UniProtKB/Swiss-Prot annotation:
Binding residues annotated for Zn(2+), in chain numbering: C69, C71, C87, C90
GO annotations of cellular component type: chloroplast; DNA-directed RNA polymerase complex; mitochondrion
UniProt keyword Nucleotidyltransferase present: yes
Protein name: DNA-directed RNA polymerase subunit beta'
Compartments where located: Plastid, Chloroplast
Record bears the keyword Phosphoprotein: no
UniProt catalytic activity: RNA(n) + a ribonucleoside 5'-triphosphate = RNA(n+1) + diphosphate
Keyword annotations of the record: Chloroplast, DNA-directed RNA polymerase, Magnesium, Metal-binding, Nucleotidyltransferase, Plastid, Transcription, Transferase, Zinc
Length: 683
């Protein structure tokens, strides 16, 4: 059992066979050692009791009922005498039944078996350490070929006959049919190596420090060679350099964690506690069992058959032994990772068995479903909608969620301010929704941040802190600029809200997690708070006005619908006039005209603008020049209008725009001015 006060983290890694045996081994008072699972049976079909030395054995994993052994005798869990802790008849320990959640067993494999995660994973750790191709290692593990044992002290049979040129040479033809089982075992122990045992021997002979030194020397040699000009050779050199770096990192990791490379080949297979792979009896004599039990049964049966062939059947052909070793390897592979060698194992109803990898990985795996995705107090969940009036660091919480999250704080303040005398009356005031409750709730929320999280949390911007504000309705309001960090949109996405309770959590939320402090992507440094989706559509609609300038009036004059017939013979129709496109001296006048419904959002208009040297010094030729009786003139360009006097002096400039462009410009101008003021304060 993991003690939550002693253990602060969980690490998954390799362990030695001695450690696996220590997890499961028990010594009975009579000196008998239990812990090894040798039978594939589970429960007896008549008594419904666990079979001895089976997958649910009470001697190995503990009693099903607390303090009651397999015989039915009961005794206190705590006994002064060591002999009294075990039943003298059945050997079951008198302990709490919860031990079956963490007490493990083991299967002693008749032959070494490689761990499929370390052989077929990407990258393959075994192939990287041995510096061998993965396909050849797989062929060696599954008995497709053998190689000669390197032996320099004495001549071997294969060396005398000259069948192999190198110390380690492949033998692609079968040797085993020429030997009986004892003869083949003797031959294999002296001359050849095959199966996972050959991999284990090579891993055991490795010196990790020498691997690091040799790999570093080779990497430096490749680095000094430089580029040869041959694209294919340069590519092979780059791949080799990357491989050497990975190999050095892997060897360094093994040294730092005190892990031996040969532990990647299993001699003892751990058996999970029975409560983690239960058998459930339902009504109607229906039995529901975990798929892992069936996979364990398969491993035990094949392992027992191999042990029988190796120990008791002296006349069995060696091909049968090698085939059985391959079956044991495949059974363990299926238990650890179903489908690693192609088609996964299926039951009689064509349903795929779930292996240990399937139980652990994925969204419904053990980690994400039961360890990471647990329900917690002081949290809520609702659909998100856009909050256009919110600041970047604010979020809108519905009244129903806010009063639930901050209920204890509201009760505390109600009692502190003597609005109520006890907790019961305070809860009644909250339930009746009295006005004082909302006043205190707003005071409490003003200085307390909340955390918003959208699953899946793939990076640290998936959970950010916000200052909550009360909103009507039942949805959470969110500023649209923070959507990219959450990878969220407003089409029905849901987000969870959490309340940090401790002062440390609140300080971390304010200093590190507030949304206005996470403006850049932590991965690449690009801005993360950029307009996306709904905002882009809104900006497009806001600035969709006539972009082709005054010349577009010839094709679609202001106020005409696309289907309206235009008389192009009338030259005055598309001629510039002040009546069609009104003039405004300021943006406030234009906004006032829009509120009075005199102009539309995308109606073209002329807005008086400050003198701009880029416009004054422009060499653009006007489209039309109009002169008035007092000598003033109007030079009309595609997007602006220049008004001059008789002395050819520019009196004013009007730009051709729309109210949408004006509104967008005002928002950007206010944002830039606010940033400049904030920057000046920091200086």
């Amino acid at each position: 059992m993991i003690d939550q006060y002693k253990h602060k983290q969980l690490q998954i890694g390799l362990v030695s066979p001695q450690q696996i045996k220590a997890w499961a081994k028990k010594i009975l008072p009579n000196g008998e050692v239990v812990g090894e699972v040798t039978r594939p049976s589970t429960f007896h079909y008549k008594t419904d009791k666990p079979e001895k030395d089976g997958l649910f054995c009470e001697r190995i994993f503990g009693p099903i009922k607390s303090g009651i052994c397999a015989c039915g005798n009961s005794r206190a869990s705590v006994a002064e005498n060591e002999d009294e802790r075990f039943c003298q008849k059945c050997g079951v320990e008198f302990v709490d039944s919860r031990i079956r959640r963490y007490q493990m067993g083991y299967i002693k494999l008749a032959c070494p078996v490689t761990h499929v995660w370390y052989l077929k994973g990407l990258p393959s750790y075994i192939a990287n350490l041995l510096d061998k191709p993965l396909k050849k290692l797989e062929g060696l593990v599954y008995g497709d070929f053998s190689f000669a044992r390197p032996s320099a002290k004495k001549p071997t049979f294969l060396r005398l006959r000259g069948l192999f040129e190198d110390e380690i040479s492949s033998c692609n033809h079968s040797i085993s049919p020429f030997f009986s089982t004892p003869g083949f075992a003797t031959f294999r122990n002296r001359e050849i190596a095959t199966g996972a045992g050959a991999i284990r021997e090579q891993l055991a002979d490795l010196d990790l420090r020498i691997i690091i030194e040799n790999s570093l020397v080779e990497w430096k040699e490749l680095e000094d060679e430089g580029y040869s000009g041959d694209e294919w050779e340069d590519r092979k050199r780059r791949i080799r350099k990357v491989f050497l770096i990975r190999r050095m990192q892997l060897a360094k990791h093994f040294i730092q964690t005190n892990v031996e490379p040969e532990w990647m080949v299993l001699c003892l297979l751990p058996v999970l506690p029975p409560e983690l792979r239960p058998i459930v009896y339902r009504s109607g004599d229906k039995v529901v069992t975990s798929d892992i039990n069936e996979l364990y049964k398969r491993v035990i049966r094949r392992n027992n058959n191999l042990a029988y062939l190796l120990k008791r059947s002296e006349l069995a052909p060696a091909d049968l032994v090698m085939c059985q070793e391959k079956l044991v390897q495949e059974a363990v592979d299926t238990l650890l990772d179903s489908g690693s060698r192609g088609q996964p194992m299926r039951d009689g109803h064509n349903k795929v068995y779930k292996s240990l990898s399937d139980v652990i990985e994925g969204k419904e795996g053990r980690f994400r479903e039961t360890l990471l995705g647990k329900r917690v107090d002081y949290s809520g969940r609702s659909v998100i909608v856009v909050g256009p009036s919110l600041s970047l660091h604010q979020c809108g919480l519905p009244l129903e969620i806010a009063i639930k999250l901050f209920q204890l704080f509201v009760i505390r303040d109600l009692i502190t301010k003597r609005a109520t005398s006890n907790v019961r009356i305070a809860k009644r005031k909250i339930w009746e929704k009295e006005p004082i409750v909302w006043e205190i709730l707003q005071e409490v929320m003003r200085g307390h941040p909340v955390l918003l999280n959208r699953a899946p949390t793939l990076h640290r911007l998936g959970i950010q802190a916000f200052q909550p504000t009360l909103v009507e309705g039942r949805t959470i309001c969110l500023h649209p600029l923070v959507c990219k960090g959450f990878n969220a949109d407003f089409d029905g996405d849901q987000m969870a809200v959490h309340l940090p309770l401790s002062l440390e959590a609140q300080a971390e939320a304010r200093l590190l997690m507030f949304s206005h402090m996470n403006l850049l992507s932590p991965a690449i440094g690009d801005p993360i708070c950029v307009p996306t989706q709904d905002m882009l559509i809104g900006l497009y609609v806001l600035t969709i006005g006539n972009r082709r300038g005054i010349c577009a009036n010839r094709y679609n004059s202001c106020g005409n619908s696309p289907n309206k017939k235009i008389n192009y013979n009338n030259n005055n129709y598309y001629k510039y006039t002040k009546d069609k496109e009104p003039h405004f001296s300021s943006s406030y006048d234009a906004l006032g005209a829009y509120r009075q419904k005199r102009i539309g959002l995308n109606s073209p208009l002329w807005l008086r603008w400050k003198l701009d040297q880029r416009i004054v010094g422009s060499r653009e030729v006007p489209i039309e020049v109009q002169y008035e009786s007092f000598g003033t003139y109007h030079e009309i360009y595609a997007h602006y209008l220049v008004v001059g006097n008789r002395k050819k002096e520019i009196r004013s400039i009007y730009i051709r725009t729309t109210l949408g462009h004006i509104s967008f410009y005002r928002e950007i101008e206010e944002a830039v001015q606010g940033f400049s003021r904030a920057y000046s304060y920091t200086i």
